[in-house]
Every structure is written in C-alpha cells, then in structure tokens.
Amino acid sequence: GSSIDNRMWKRGSGTWPFKCERVFIQHNRLMNAHGPQDSYSAHIDYGCKDVVIQYNLSFNNEGGFAEVLGDNVNCGFRYNISINDGYREDPDGLQWNKKGKIFWVSTFCGGPTRCPSEGTFFYNNTIYVDSTLNPEIYVWPESGDVHILNNLVYMESSGEILESYLETQD
C-alpha cells in the first residue's frame, strides 16, 4: 500500500484479477506488499472463472500469500513458493479479521450479500515460515467447494503452531 496518493487505501496486492475469465498468472516475483488490508502476494477478487496463479515466487507480503474472494468458479493457486508471507498482526486481536494468512478464502463479493465459490483450490505450493511469524489458514463459513491439498508448509522449530480456521454454520 502507499500513502503517496489519497486515492490509495494503504493496501494492495502484487496482482488481483477481477471479474476475469481464463487467466494464468505465472513466473512472477510478488513481494513486499504492505498495508492494513489485503496486501497479499496475489488475490483472486470476486466474479472470476478459471483463474490460475502458478509458478510464482512470493515473499514478505504483510497480508499473506493467497487470498480468494467469493463468487468464483475453478480458481486457485498451485506450484508457487511463499517465503515469510502473512506477518501482519491484527490490531483488534481478532483471529480472522486482519491477521496475516497463508491461505484465506472469503465469501465477499462486493456487497452485504455473501457468495460462495465453486472449485477453489490450493495445491502443490511450498510455504516457508520463519520462527518470528505465525500466519493463519482461514476459510470463511459457507465458502463453497474449497480444496487445500498436498501443500508443503515448513515452519522453523521455534515458530508457533499454525492456526487453521475452517468454520461451518450451525
């Protein structure tokens, strides 16, 4: 994020497709995004179909590594490397609010109505977290069809246990 221009909200991610179809984002270095919201290496905004983020190097992004919003179909992250992403601590102390995350899936789709996605995926990514960080994995309730498979997450020995929140509605 930046405060150079007052139209910037002190947030931003390396890239974020929005209402796109059939997009591949690959072979990039996504680094140093900083701010109190978003600030991921990349995030898939709402209204996308068949968006794949693959073969990228991500590091030092305050918000986290991979974010997927609602109302998407067959979108996700595969074959990426993440190093020390998700170092933000939530100022309100809420576990899921603004704290840094490795993977985050939400149902936000532009307004108060929440929208699940179909076929969200995170697979074959390699994630390194040093001992000073404790990012989360968080999937909002009713996020739809989400697959988190075969990812390698390495945390240095003195790091905290990785918190994961996969909630269901009662």
Show the residue positions of the predicted features.
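Glycine- and acidic/polar-rich repeat regions and solenoidal domains
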Residues: 1-170
